[in-house]
Amino acid sequence: MPNVLEDLASGIVVTEFDGDTGIATVVNVSGWLFENLGQVNNYLYTNFEGEGASGTYGEMDIEAQSVLKELYLANYYNKEARNALRGITTSTASGDNVLSLRDGESAVTFVNRNEVSKVYRGLATDCMNRVTQLAAQYNIYQAQPRQLGGIDASGIGVTYT
């Protein structure tokens, strides 16, 4: 049985982080995806479980995978927003946060951590809006008719007298 979550995690690392394992590793991403399958189940009214992400109707389809991917990205951006406010986002040396220098009248401009955090929060909000949109589309297009009547019901082999 293929490991859907590991394949999805590999895709996230390659496409979203350009394969930079310093940002996220496949193991970390697939672990997060596995631990948060319940969120997808809540949004999509499904029951995916296990490493193969299988449920009542089989393996997790591509639409459900895209919802899980957006949930991961929203979580990642929220975490980065918190880290930016703490001032620890990829800041290894003093001076990493210098934005510009001017020699005339000696001006130094630093990165505004609050603005960086707002950008990350905006990205997280965009991802959650996308999750809501994708979940609604998934639930609409995966819905089965509850009742057949009229012309649709003719020819199904049932005769009412």
Feature map (PLM): residue ranges:
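Conserved short "hinge" loops at termini or chain/domain junctions
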Residues: 1-61, 133-161
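Divalent metal-cofactor coordination and adjacent catalytic microenvironments
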Residues: 27-130, 137
